[in-house]
Amino acid sequence: MPLDRPSGGRYSLTMVTVGFHASHEQISPAQLLKDVQHAERAGFDAAMCSDHIEPWSARQGHSGFAWSWLGAALATTGLRFGVVTAPGQRYHPAIIAHASATLACMFPGRFWFAPGSGENMNEHITGDPWPAKDLRQRRLEECVDVIRRLHRGEEVTHRGLVTVEQARIWDVPDSPPPLIAPAISVDTARRAAAWADGLVTVNQPAPKLRDMLAAYRDGGGKGKAVLQVHLSWAGSEQEAAAIALDQWRTNTFAPPIPWDLPSAGHFDGIGEHVGEEQVRGAVNVAASLNAHAEWLSDYVELGFDELYLHFVGQQQDAFIDAFAAEVLPQVRTADPASTEPQLAAATASPASDAPA
């Protein structure tokens, strides 16, 4: 299979991209590779994942290494891929620069990554203290500068919140991979406008998403607006709700909780008494495919260019086939409009499965 994606895709460049979210925390790496191949065959346009060492719950039970998996996924599909990751503690920024440059060299134009300030559940393994959010944000910005310089082929020495001594990457891509800013708050989106090549967030109440997009754009933010959408679908409303409650109830808490807890066990502890109503605040739950299509179309109207669909269940086949046949065609006909979208207001600001 050629490494470059064939030019001239199936869909217009002006049409919204609808991608598949590959949830390493919930599905084994081998099965997830099959799932993303299935998603491509069914008609999804792209894929993304998050770089975790710890799942959000023991019930999820997985957490393969995203960077190893990405090489296999890029080599065995023609999709474009992105990954949310966190340089600065678990990873030295030169390692992220090296890994991302190598993928971009082998698969030009098909890889982006979203460097975030991190989550303690992944970063605590170093044994280093967990910094406050503002310090993590400044550390991230140093890492972004280091990574960009390394991608340009420079030899980098840097001493600050991270230390780099005479680092150089010998194989650099002709076009460096875009660095997309992950954010779940208005303040983070505004701050990211200074450095990011785009913005990625998760489904939240429409006013919050609108404010985030405005903060990013008003601050001079460039590039695409990307939305990861947590959803649950099944043959009945009851089953769809049960799937979401089982798999995603630990992801219903607003920051700083998702940033600061250290393990799946801690998340399971605070999620013990979460009910269906709270889960519905973080996950779009419906048995109706038309309802999901309407939600997704509303996100397009808000101004998002790319949607990555995360079915929160662990068995992906039925979701992939049903959404490819019934939902994706409806979403692709949606146009950004000045009319107010009819997104239902969520009851909680959901936790991201991405560093922010």
Regions found by a protein language model. Give the residues of each.
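Active-site-adjacent structural elements that line small-molecule/cofactor binding pockets in enzymes
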Residues: 2-356
